[in-house]
Amino acid sequence: MVEPLLSGIVLGLIVVTLSGLFYAAYKQYKRPNELGG
């Protein structure tokens, strides 16, 4: 039986990681030359 705390931490990390990736991709799409790249 999976502990609720462990599963919560894993889900939290996944959500934060996906959110960070989408946010970075969105920034690069909106402003491709903002960071010189």
UniProtKB/Swiss-Prot annotation:
Concerning InterPro entries, the annotation shows: Cyt_6/f_cplx_su5, Cyt_6/f_cplx_su5_sf
**Is Transport among this UniProt entry's keywords?**
yes
Domain of life according to the entry: Bacteria
Q: Does the keyword Thylakoid apply?
A: yes
Q: Any stretches that span the bilayer, and where are they?
A: 5-25
Which Pfam family, giving just one, matches this sequence? PetG
Subcellular location(s) per record = Cellular thylakoid membrane
What Gene Ontology cellular component terms go with this record? cytochrome b6f complex; plasma membrane-derived thylakoid membrane
Q: Which GO terms describe its molecular function?
A: electron transporter, transferring electrons within cytochrome b6/f complex of photosystem II activity
Q: Describe, as the record does, how this protein assembles with itself and its partners.
A: The 4 large subunits of the cytochrome b6-f complex are cytochrome b6, subunit IV (17 kDa polypeptide, PetD), cytochrome f and the Rieske protein, while the 4 small subunits are PetG, PetL, PetM and PetN. The complex functions as a dimer.
* Primary role: Component of the cytochrome b6-f complex, which mediates electron transfer between photosystem II (PSII) and photosystem I (PSI), cyclic electron flow around PSI, and state transitions. PetG is required for either the stability or assembly of the cytochrome b6-f complex.
- Protein name from the UniProt record: Cytochrome b6-f complex subunit 5
